[in-house]
Regions:
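Active-site-proximal alpha/beta segments of enzymes that process anionic O-linked groups
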Residues: 5-20, 27, 44-50, 57-206, ...
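Short acidic, glycine/proline-rich loop/turn micro-motifs
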Residues: 64, 220-225, 297-298
Length: 850
């Protein structure tokens, strides 16, 4: 296999590996074809008002101020005197689209749904809004249209402000909520002169949805503990009070209006969300009005947290729910069918109604969830051979009938508590069954991918050994290749394809299941290399082999632990710092070794630092910029004294422009921070400079000298200019230390190669990227290359996790992108944060030359 073909095959294989993750673990559990289920008894409310305070944390609403006064006096009075309250537990990802879908449709979208966008991709399943007679909604253009466009018919109406209004640098983001409250008031005032609208508003099964984005915007811009965030909560509290008063007056205090206030997600202390920290997943829930229970006083409550004591609510019953449970609660209050795809369980404790109504509602809930289970089971049964199909035994067809008959009998006999208990059991079993059938093929597909992964890794190792060692004797002897393995693998592929065909499997299953066939055929073709390698390994001392194997396992475990505990990287870097001591390099290159040790120790500090802080530390960014300029001056002076001088003034112009970009980026960061702090918005000049710097960062290094160290120096300057613009604190120093360590690593590897009688010092000094160089001509593979490869992978992981957790982009401060934009744009902001994380890795890759 030639090099181009090998590279293309590698890209294709890894693309399949990447796609398989989403297909196996993040596929949507959505099913269609269910029958709507509705409680047969009259509902307690004619209309429902849903307030969603976007980004509102539970503790921010319920906790008292320093002077023991409530943060939201009106809502506090409601939960103490008129309604029920608790915590709504959200799921990952804690983003606006999945959160609102769970609230309004009772359905948890898969994790990949966060990439579907907002208004561009309407929800593709049923919701409370869709089942209502009329729904009027006010708020963000990112949320409302997706429910309106996803609804059947034209009964969901939206009123949105402009997308440009969602500006994190605005003077007062609370104006977004004021806009909503004002437009709701004017809407109801206008209905008095519009008989058609007035009649529609007075019908049954009406929903009013107020999406309040100001709290989320202020949280991103100023943090949840800021004055702006808390003041926004107070304004929302006042606005809710005004809306409730206005509605009660409009409807003549008929007692037929139910109110629910909650949030789609919370927010971290540094103003981001998306992951599973309690500050993001714990959101408030307050319900009051028609059909809702009054506060229940209790003497003790069984909760492991200390929230009740902190919030001084120990005597009022706290009723926690899952976020998806709110959808069936809303449906029950106004008597609409439960959303078809809802997986929520009706929280009966919130209902103030007869036991008969509660039992009937819970029975309806159970049938609605069971309908999904039956559809999911039939789908899986159709695509699985009968003798291979394994049903979900706790909920067989006979068990389903028994559950439903028994529950209905209990209701007829007025044994409502027994009926409710049985329905809850049925719901839990149906949900487990849904999960069972949704993950039915996960093991099968996972094994196929694992076999492919092991096969590809084995093949790559064999190619490296074959290319860079002398294990080619067998290949020279056995010139004739047997056709037996080819026919065997072709037959295996045909069997797999036929098996998938008769099961009507999706086309992706063919890719995942057939991929191991050509990969392992390629491995079998290199059987002679495996035999020669095994013979050589058996000749090695057993003690050395076992010791080397244990070190490899320890190194791999260290890398795995670093994904969960960043401090593990510190341990590895400190071990790296002591590496020269156990080799000859401490004797033959003391100066280089000392610098290596110091830089390893400095770099080891970063994983111990918090991923982000509550407040930006702009002085550290300025220090990083000035340090970069100082190092640049010394480097230019060093290059000018070297034998390989510049081709002309053009080379110097590139470096001077890059240094100017560093200085300008440092100024822009400081200027932008001060401007936003004074609520003056993002200066246009700063925004233009930031985007121009980003655009030029990838092009300027191509204009620099092509000699190794001079090109690497240019790459560092370009990446640092962009990284400074994306920094808010100590992380600005990270790429400087990392790149310095990488440059010293090159020197260290030169010294290490001298142990084998090889020296690249002179060759690296004149190494030129302008000329094609075959690196394989330098030397054969040595055991030390495994250590070198481990260093390479470890430094890549360090580049990703050194200043944050790349597994969760929300561990990075959203203020990092404010030099580029402050108007809400999730994909642009997320892309810039990913660029920030990747920049350090680009530095790492660009300096991996040995």
């Amino acid at each position: 296999m030639g090099v181009p073909v090998f590279i293309l095959a590698g890209l294709l294989v890894h693309f399949v590996f990447l796609a398989s993750i989403f297909d196996i673990y993040f596929s949507s559990p959505l099913v269609h074809g269910m029958t709507p289920q509705q409680t047969p008894l009259p509902p307690p409310a004619k209309r429902l008002v849903l307030f969603v305070a976007d980004g509102l944390r539970a503790d921010s609403l319920f906790e008292l101020n320093s002077n023991n006064t409530p943060q939201a006096p009106y809502l506090r009075a409601i939960l103490e005197n008129n309604g029920s309250w608790g915590i709504s537990h959200t799921r990952v990802p804690t983003e606006s689209r999945p959160g609102h879908v769970a609230l309004i449709a009772g359905f948890y979208e898969d994790v990949s749904a966060v990439a579907k966008g907002w208004k561009e991709n309407p929800v593709e399943f049923d919701s409370v809004f869709n089942e209502s007679k009329h729904t009027w909604s006010w708020g963000s253009p990112d949320i409302l249209p997706m429910f309106a466009k996803g609804a059947t018919g034209d009964h969901v109406y939206t009123f949105c402000y402009t997308a440009e209004s969602e500006d994190f640098g605005a003077q007062d983001a609370a104006e977004l909520d004021t806009w909503v409250f004002d437009h709701v008031k004017s809407f109801f005032n206008s209905s008095r002169s519009n008989q058609t609208l007035f009649s529609a508003l007075n019908e049954e099964k009406v929903v009013l949805f107020l999406h309040l984005l100001g709290i989320d915007t202020n949280g991103h811009a100023h943090r949840p503990y800021s004055k702006e965030y808390k003041e926004n909560i107070r304004k929302v509290d006042e606005g809710v009070e005004e809306i409730v008063s206005m509605l009660e007056s409009f409807y003549g205090n008929d007692g037929k209006t139910a109110y629910i206030l909650t949030s789609d997600h919370g927010m971290t202390d540094w103003g981001s969300h998306g992951a599973g920290h309690p500050s993001e997943t714990l959101t408030p829930l307050i319900a009051w009005g028609a059909g809702v229970n009054y506060p229940q006083e209790v003497t003790s409550q069984l909760f492991e947290d200390n929230f009740l004591k902190e919030w001084k609510l120990e005597n009022l019953k706290r009723m926690d729910v899952n976020q998806a449970d709110i959808a069936p609660l809303m449906a029950s209050l106004i008597g609409v069918p439960f959303p078809l795809n809802s997986v929520g369980t009706l929280p009966l404790e919130y209902l103030n109604n007869s036991d008969h109504f509660k039992a009937e509602s819970m029975f309806t809930n159970a049938v609605q969830v069971l309908e999904q289970f039956k559809v999911k089971m039939s789908q899986k049964k159709r695509t699985t051979l009968s003798f291979l199909f394994t049903p979900f035994k706790p909920l067989s067809d006979s068990e389903q009938i028994n559950f439903l008959k028994k529950a209905r009998l209990y209701i007829q006999q007025q044994k409502y508590s027994e009926a409710v208990s049985l329905c809850k059991t049925l719901i839990n079993l149906a949900l487990k069954g849904l999960s069972y059938y949704h993950t039915y093929d996960r093991l099968f597909l996972g094994l196929s991918i694992a076999v492919s992964f092991v096969g590809w890794t084995t093949y790559v190792i064999l190619v490296i050994i074959k290319t860079h060692t002398n294990l080619i004797k067998a290949a020279q002897i056995n010139n004739k290749e047997s056709t037996g393995p080819l026919y065997s693998f072709m037959f295996a592929g045909m069997i797999i394809a036929f098996f998938l065909l008769i099961q009507a499997s999706p086309w992706t299953y063919y890719v995942y299941c057939l991929l191991p066939v050509p990969i392992w055929y390629a491995v079998v073709r290199e059987l002679h290399v495996i035999q020669d390698l095994a013979a050589n390994l058996w000749s090695l001392p057993v003690g050395h082999s076992v010791g080397f194997l244990l070190i490899c396992i320890l190194g791999i475990e260290l890398l795995v632990f670093s994904f969960f505990y960043r401090s593990t990287l510190t341990v590895g870097l400190l071990v790296f710092a002591g590496w020269p001591v156990i080799t000859q390099m401490w004797v033959q290159a003391k100066r280089t070794t000392l610098i290596w040790t110091l830089l390893c120790v400095f770099l080891a500090v970063f994983p111990l630092m918090p991923v982000v802080g509550r407040e930006p530390n702009i002085p550290l960014v300025i220090v990083a910029g000035l340090t970069t300029l100082l190092i640049s001056c010394f480097s230019l002076a060093s290059f000018s004294r070297s034998e390989n001088k510049y081709r002309g003034k053009e080379d110097l112009k590139v470096y001077f422009y890059q240094m100017f970009s560093i200085a300008l980026s440092t100024y822009v960061v400081s200027s932008t921070h001060n401007s936003l702090k004074n609520k003056q918005g993002l200066p246009v000049f700063n925004q233009i400079v930031s985007w121009m710097t980003l655009a030029s960062s990838s092009a300027l290094p191509l204009l620099s000298p092509t000699l190794l160290f001079q090109r690497l120096f240019s790459i560092l300057l370009s990446l640092m200019a962009t990284y400074l613009l994306l920094s808010t604190g100590y992380e600005a120093l990270f790429p400087l230390v990392l790149s310095g360590l990488m440059l010293v690593w090159i020197q260290m590897e030169q010294e290490a190669l001298q142990h084998y009688g090889l020296s690249l010092r002179s060759k690296l000094a004149v190494f030129n990227f302008a000329y094609a160089t075959d690196i394989t001509q330098f030397r054969q593979l040595h055991l030390d290359d495994i250590r070198r490869s481990f260093f390479f992978v470890f430094f890549i992981v360090t580049a990703f996790f050194g200043t944050g957790n790349i597994a969760s982009v929300n561990s990075f401060d959203p203020a990092s992108v404010y030099c580029f934009l402050t108007v809400f744009s999730p994909f642009m902001m997320g892309g810039l944060l990913l660029l920030k994380v990747s920049n350090c890795t680009f530095v790492k890759f660009s300096q991996r030359t040995v």
